[in-house]
Design a protein with these regions (language model features):
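Active-site metal-binding loops of divalent metal-dependent hydrolases
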Residues: 33-35, 59, 84-85, 128-129
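Conserved beta-strand hairpin/beta-sheet module of binuclear metal-dependent hydrolase folds
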Residues: 1-49
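A short, structured active-site edge motif that brings together acidic residues
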Residues: 80-87, 92
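General small-molecule cofactor/ligand-binding pocket signal
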Residues: 11, 80, 122-125
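Residues at the C-termini of beta-strands that transition into short coil/loop
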Residues: 14-16, 83, 126
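Short alpha-helical
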Residues: 37, 61-62, 87, 94
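Metallo-beta-lactamase
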Residues: 89-129
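Active-site metal-binding motif and surrounding structural segment of the metallo-beta-lactamase
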Residues: 40-81
Length: 129
């Protein structure tokens, strides 16, 4: 019998509220870790699971904002993201400028530190991968 991994939802309690932002964990792969403002909750709720891979569906801060902080915390963590989003992970300045115009003074509370991701940690995906 073939065993298929089962995804586990991990509610990161954005702004202390449940069912707002949810990451998913599948055998140490974290799909969309959420914002950096929730990284401690994510880590606590993962329990003994140490993330080995982040798989990002896209780079919006509610899905991928914690990526740089998690890479700093877990030195072997690998990141998979579409090729269009990868440059914004390496240098998030344009993303932060755009988000700052939208969220203003609430930026830090909503999203936390958006840290750059070392380029060598990123594997880009394209097309239908």
């Amino acid at each position: 019998m073939v065993r298929h991994p089962v995804s586990r939802p991990v509610d990161v309690l954005h702004l202390g509220r449940d069912r707002v932002i949810c990451a998913y964990e599948i055998d140490g792969v974290i799909v969309d870790p959420g914002p950096a403002s929730c990284v401690e909750t994510l880590i606590d709720r993962l329990g003994p699971v140490e993330p080995r891979v982040l798989l990002l569906t896209h780079i919006h801060l509610d899905h991928a904002g914690a990526t740089g902080v998690l890479c700093r915390r877990y030195p072997k963590l690998k990141v998979y993201v579409h090729e269009v989003g990868a440059p914004h992970l390496v240098d998030p300045s344009k993303l932060l400028k755009s988000a700052g115009r939208l969220y203003g003074d609430a930026m830090w509370e909503l999203w936390g530190e958006v840290a750059p991701v070392p380029e060598e940690r990123i594997t880009t995906l394209s097309g239908g991968e």
